[in-house]
């Protein structure tokens, strides 16, 4: 294999496009964060009234990362607003369902109220509870997600009417008519200035205990020292999974991990913001078609951060974006995006997305990104030729047949094909060239 490819002069000329594109995104971050905080304040005001009507539902002011995450995005996917239940989760019975556990990493359970124990009486009323048979010696009955959602919906309607009547929220900011009860959440539209933000209101059971299944990922590199263990030692919450079942949720843990990546030097979060905007504007036609979500791209960044550990990987903006692109292309080609904390769970399985069509769009961008990056007439000009030739998809599919390819050296081969490897470490170059020799018959001769 020849030495790693060096950037061509044409590529060097195009580098400022990435920074112009990022600058345009950053110019929107502060207004987006302000819009979100105003909308969040409206919803929190309503939830305060919900709590006054029914103390079983708590207002949580402690989790301030949603505005940070919303500012990173260009997409308009719904934001979660969690409503904790006033219940001692450690006093409840966590009961596995009788059916076989699914193989997608989700831990499903019933929430049982024990016959022995005090302080749970508020959850044994008919509106949220289904009693067990008299023959069950341990369990009095179960807290039912569908019933909890129904109660919460009625409370939200009453709270919205109250807040509007007493001028606690701005006119037109929120309308009870927009409230929709879905299977696993309540959807609500909140107006903030000229922007309308969609929220998913989700009842959640806070737990102090972490999930044993997460212990295996606490040693992953790529994060500030000790941060992964500290974050994953926090409790794993429970949210509705169906009408009767609850499931573990790691969404908050993932957002905390994203925040930790933002404390590191380099363009990790910038690369995520760029791909989310390209996804929204180009791959999803300004949100008019179904496609990848911010959550998918966030997962790609988390994986890229443990695959590419050198500061040089993230020092240059274009190269940082391609660290995410090669991981994303591999996931699309193999039709498998592993959950970062539950790798056995495939986030693309059952998504209903046209993964083949999405792959073509992502590959087209990776090969010739300039057209999607031009946001001003002064950026018009001839695009350089495609960065890759044939054979890429066969190379990208290798991890499907041999999981050992899911490693830095393999992804370095992909980076070199896109001419953005730019790593001087001799051991890493040697490992990359060794993998290339194994894959050259499948990956083609271009490099």
Curated annotation (Swiss-Prot):
Domain of life assignment: Eukaryota
Protein known as: Protein mab-21-like 4
């Amino acid at each position: 294999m020849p030495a790693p490819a060096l950037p061509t002069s044409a590529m060097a000329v195009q580098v400022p496009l990435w920074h112009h594109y990022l600058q345009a995104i950053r110019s929107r971050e502060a207004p987006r964060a302000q819009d979100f905080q105003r909308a969040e304040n409206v919803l929190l005001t309503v939830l305060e009234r919900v709590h006054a009507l029914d103390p079983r539902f708590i207002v949580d002011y402690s989790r301030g990362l949603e505005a940070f995450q919303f500012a990173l995005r260009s997409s308009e996917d719904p934001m979660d607003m969690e409503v904790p239940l006033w219940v001692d989760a450690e006093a409840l019975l966590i009961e596995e369902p009788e059916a076989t556990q699914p193989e997608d990493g989700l831990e499903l359970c019933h929430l049982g109220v024990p016959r022995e124990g005090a302080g749970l009486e508020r959850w044994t009323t008919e509106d949220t509870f289904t009693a067990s048979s008299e023959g069950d010696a341990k369990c009095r009955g179960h807290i039912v997600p569908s019933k909890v959602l129904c109660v919460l919906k009625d409370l939200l309607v009453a709270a919205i009417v109250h807040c509007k009547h007493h001028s606690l929220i701005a006119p037109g900011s929120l309308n009870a008519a927009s409230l929709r009860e879905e299977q696993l959440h309540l959807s609500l539209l909140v107006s903030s200035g000229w922007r309308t933000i969609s929220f998913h209101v989700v009842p959640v059971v806070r737990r102090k205990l972490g999930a044993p299944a997460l212990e295996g990922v606490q040693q992953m590199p790529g994060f500030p020292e000790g941060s992964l263990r500290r974050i994953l030692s926090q409790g794993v919450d429970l949210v509705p999974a169906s009408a009767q079942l609850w499931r573990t949720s790691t969404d908050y843990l993932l957002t905390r991990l994203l925040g930790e990546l933002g404390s590191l030097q380099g363009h990790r979060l910038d690369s995520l913001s760029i791909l989310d905007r390209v996804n929204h504007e180009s791959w999803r036609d300004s949100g008019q078609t179904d496609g990848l979500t911010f959550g998918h791209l966030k997962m790609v960044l988390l994986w890229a951060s443990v695959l590419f550990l050198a500061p040089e990987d993230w020092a240059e903006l274009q190269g940082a974006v391609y660290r995410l692109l090669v991981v994303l292309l591999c996931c699309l080609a193999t039709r498998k995006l592993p959950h970062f904390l539950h790798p056995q769970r495939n986030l693309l399985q059952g998504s209903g997305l046209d993964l083949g069509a999405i792959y073509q769009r992502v590959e087209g961008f990776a090969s010739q990104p300039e057209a999607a990056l031009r946001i001003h007439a002064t950026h018009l000009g001839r695009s350089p030729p495609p960065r890759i030739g044939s054979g890429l998809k066969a190379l990208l599919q290798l991890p499907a047949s041999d999981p050992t390819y899911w490693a830095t050296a393999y992804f370095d081969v992909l980076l070199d094909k896109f001419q953005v490897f730019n790593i001087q470490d001799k051991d890493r170059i040697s490992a990359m060239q060794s993998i290339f020799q194994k894959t050259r018959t499948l990956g083609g001769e271009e490099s």
